A protein has these predicted regions:
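Short, conserved active-site loops that position catalytic residues or coordinate cofactors/metal ions
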Residues: 1-7
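C-terminal active-site rim and adjoining tail of enzyme catalytic domains
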Residues: 127, 146, 153, 159
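Active-site proximal loops enriched in glycine and acidic residues that flank catalytic Cys/His/Asp
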Residues: 124-126, 158-160, 192
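Histidine/acidic-residue-rich catalytic or RNA/ligand-binding cores of hydrolases
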Residues: 9, 13-14, 105-113, 132-148, ...
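Short acidic/histidine-rich active-site segments
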Residues: 154-168, 188
Length: 206
């Protein structure tokens, strides 16, 4: 199983509304691979507001939300954390993208507790740790997330965050952290598609 998402249009991604409206035309099974199509939505502020209208959320198979610097109106560490928690409590949001990339200062322990409570997965993001991104806090932050996930026995999802076709399923920056944290395979939902589908929190009916 593979899920493909485009950043929603608020951040200037390719995902204008008509793009998401047309996703129903795409087969959900191609070349023996099950596809889930969705959006990486923008968390806009410390209230946890998400962009795109709810009508579009309902059209998607998978809904990821994350903080992006171009449209994020942040505050203190506590305020930022509460904004992400509010987004996690949104019944449509199933995954929080790259919480460890350093765009906003966050309390990872609080996020992990809410992840366990709400079944909103936290992503361990490969691309944010690429040398070309110059995000020096990304690796230590993601290591902390792995250690907390292990402590609280909370599953995570690995994301390649591929910005080009050759980057798809590239987890080369994640694996050294997995080894360092001695992170158990059973908490990585990428390895268990059936468990991933069962773990995702149910969203409101379309």
């Amino acid at each position: 199983a593979t899920f493909l998402t485009s950043v929603s249009s608020y951040e200037g991604g390719c995902g204008f509304e008509v793009y998401f409206r047309n996703l129903h035309c795409v087969p959900r099974q191609l070349y023996g691979i099950k596809l889930m199509l969705g959006a990486e939505l923008n968390i806009l502020n410390t209230k946890g507001d998400i962009d795109l209208d709810e009508d579009y959320w309902r059209m998607l198979d998978i809904r990821i939300a994350g903080i992006h610097s171009l449209c994020w109106q942040g505050g203190s560490k506590e305020e930022n954390t509460q904004g992400v928690i509010n987004a996690m409590r949104n019944p449509f949001v199933q995954i929080i993208s790259h919480p460890g990339d350093g765009t906003a200062e966050l309390d990872f322990e609080e996020l992990m507790k809410v992840s366990r409570e709400t079944h909103t997965l936290l992503e361990i993001n490969n691309h944010s740790m690429a040398p070309i991104r110059h995000k020096t806090v990304a690796a230590p932050n993601n290591l902390e997330l792995l250690e907390l996930a292990k402590k609280y026995e909370t599953p995570v999802i690995f994301g390649s965050d591929a910005h080009f076709s050759t980057m798809i399923a590239d987890y080369s920056n994640i694996m050294p952290l997995v080894e360092k944290a001695e992170f158990p395979d059973e908490l990585v939902l990428n390895y268990q598609p059936e468990k991933f589908m069962a773990y995702l929190k149910p969203t409101p009916e379309k």
